[in-house]
């Protein structure tokens, strides 16, 4: 009986050990794939710069240079002012309140409270409601998991995935390309929010919160109803 139990225990231990090795190798594999994809994006972006040598593609060249400059400007804001993540969420909510009169705040507040969202009844203006909702969104575990996960992943790909100066450049360029793609997608699907971020030099940082924003349906800020806005905010706060 003892030997049988010992054999079963040994087999189980080997199975667990094999699973741990599989997990470890899967992690290494995924990191390697992410790094290669990032460098691939960097190579793609670097190849776009050949357009600067052709007279017919100066508009492409100009767009690339502008994206690089605005990415660096956004990154500088992120380093100096960690509040920009909150600012981007606040700006997003503001776009939906731009055509809402002040008295609408209480109506929307009642709908949020009725859905189980805890907000102070002292909220009287759109501005205060926007600040309160933006704060609650930024405090949700899902939001922090997504945003900080993206920040850490970007930092890891640039630093840990780079063993040479060339790799550093390609990884940074890859990150800029990811940011540019996200900004372009936003411009195509939600021009109101894109323009608001652009005015604040933050559109190239949008990629950090993109999964949060695309996780809720897009609604036209010009015609959104109070019920639709309340439902949108509730989804973001959960």
Which residues does each predicted region cover?
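Generic alpha-helical secondary structure signal
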Residues: 83, 87, 103-106, 119, ...
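Terminal export/targeting leaders at protein ends
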Residues: 1-111
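Membrane-engaging insertion elements
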Residues: 8, 29-68, 72, 151-217
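Generic secondary-structure transition motif, activating predominantly at the C-termini of alpha-helices
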Residues: 79, 93, 97, 113-116, ...
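N-terminal amphipathic/basic membrane-interacting segments and domains
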Residues: 7-18, 192-200, 231-235
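Short, Lys/Arg-enriched charge-dense amphipathic segments
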Residues: 57, 62, 124-135, 213-224
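C-terminal assembly and membrane-engagement modules of membrane-active proteins
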Residues: 202-238
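Membrane-inserting effector segments that mediate pore formation, membrane fusion
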Residues: 113-182
């Amino acid at each position: 009986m003892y030997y049988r139990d010992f054999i079963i225990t040994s087999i189980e231990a080997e199975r667990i050990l094999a699973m741990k090795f599989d997990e470890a190798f899967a992690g290494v594999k995924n990191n390697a794939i992410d790094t290669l994809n990032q460098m691939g994006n960097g190579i793609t972006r670097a190849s776009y710069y050949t357009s600067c040598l052709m007279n017919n593609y100066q508009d492409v060249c100009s767009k690339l240079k502008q994206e690089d400059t605005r990415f660096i400007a956004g990154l500088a804001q992120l380093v100096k002012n960690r509040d920009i993540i909150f600012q981007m969420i606040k700006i997003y909510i503001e776009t939906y309140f731009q055509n809402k009169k002040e008295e609408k705040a209480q109506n929307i507040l009642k709908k949020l409270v009725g859905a189980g969202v805890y907000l102070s009844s002292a909220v009287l203006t759109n501005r205060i409601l926007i600040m309160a909702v933006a704060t609650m969104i930024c405090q949700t575990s899902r939001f922090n998991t997504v945003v900080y996960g993206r920040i850490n992943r970007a930092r890891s790909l640039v630093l840990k995935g780079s063993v040479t100066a060339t790799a550093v450049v390609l990884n940074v360029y890859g990150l800029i390309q990811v940011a540019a793609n996200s900004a372009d997608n936003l411009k195509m699907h939600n021009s109101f929010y894109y323009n608001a971020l652009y005015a604040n030099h933050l559109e190239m940082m949008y990629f950090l919160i993109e999964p949060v924003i695309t996780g809720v349906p897009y609604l036209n800020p010009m015609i959104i109803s109070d019920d639709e806005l309340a439902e949108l905010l509730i989804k973001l706060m959960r």
